[in-house]
Amino acid sequence: MKQSLFISLLLLFTNVAFAQDAKLIEAAKKDGKLIVYGTMQSDIFEPLQKIFQKKTGITVDYWRTSATKVMERALTEARAGKALFDLVMSTEDTQRIMLKEGILTKYESPMWKDFPKEAIDPQLGPRARNHIVGVMYNRSVIKPADAPKTLEDLVKPQYRGKLVMADPTLHTTTAQWLANLHKLLGKEKADKFIRDLAAMKPVLVESFAPAADRVTTGETPIGITYVYYVFLNGQKGAPVDYVRGDYRLLGDASYMSLFHKAPHPNAAKAFIDFFLDDESMNLMAKAGEFVNRKGVYPPVPDADKIKFVEMDDLGESFYAEKRKEFQKLFR
């Protein structure tokens, strides 16, 4: 089994009790297991699996992929009436689509009270984590003095052939990021930036993870990806950093939601309670996640200075139109 990068944190937290409803736990134990489809790195999720199993005896099976693929698999299984999963953990835009399709149901965890009211969606619950998108670069290939200083620097001629990003015709969150750039640059500058970015002929990959991997190896030294990969890949010795700019960075929220026909509903509810608990949130932050708790930051350089600008969910029909536009620009 793959060793967790955070096994020491697992040992630290195994003796910490989390408050849960006794009746729910008893019912959850009868379920015996639960299945989660999610986007969280396996190295971060694994300690949570082990802690929860140690506390409850309930097994957690986890399938990890991109947000788009989580959504696609969940919808395919649900439509076929052959769903195996209990919980989906993914970005807000994909959760909205699944909610609209009617496959998610509301579970109001007692842990909601520990989150700011403005961070709680009436249907999806607390915005547990913020996925912050930025520009990551390899310091061994691109010296800090030569690296882009702002987002707009990314399209300068010297970076042509050195860029990687998720394919916006396939990756929902990248399409969302491009469509929300006006929040940082204004509409006119954002439109020009997108055209210029496409003209740079970036390497297109499936999602943010392989984009970060290519930056880490230096194969493509600059990439658009989640900022937490700076910590995650840096922990493995990679010489990576991210472009600060004015610290305003777009991002998406992550939610964990209950499938409306969950095979193991009580175990799933118990896991949601555990996942939103203070100890779990702190564990995730120490592992590089931007959790939505005031004053709790990941060990990413200048994490406390980042000004999170939440991306709007623009709807499935909008993304369908945008994908056509991006197909012409990026392909």
Language model features: what each stretch is:
Residues 35-49, 61-78, 82-219:
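Extracytoplasmic ligand-binding site segments that recognize negatively charged/polar headgroups
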Residues 93-97, 216, 221-241:
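A ligand-binding cleft/hinge motif common to bilobed small-molecule-binding domains
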Residues 13-19:
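Sec/Tat signal peptide C-region and signal peptidase I cleavage site
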Residues 298-331:
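Extracellular/periplasmic bilobal clamshell ligand-binding domains
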Residues 114-117, 130-131, 161-169, 193-198, 204-205, 274-297, ...:
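Periplasmic-binding protein-like
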Residues 134-141, 178-182, 253-267, 275, ...:
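A bilobed periplasmic-binding-protein/Venus flytrap-type ligand-binding module shared by bacterial periplasmic
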Residues 21-29, 33-35, 39-59, 233:
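Short, polar/charged alpha-helical segment
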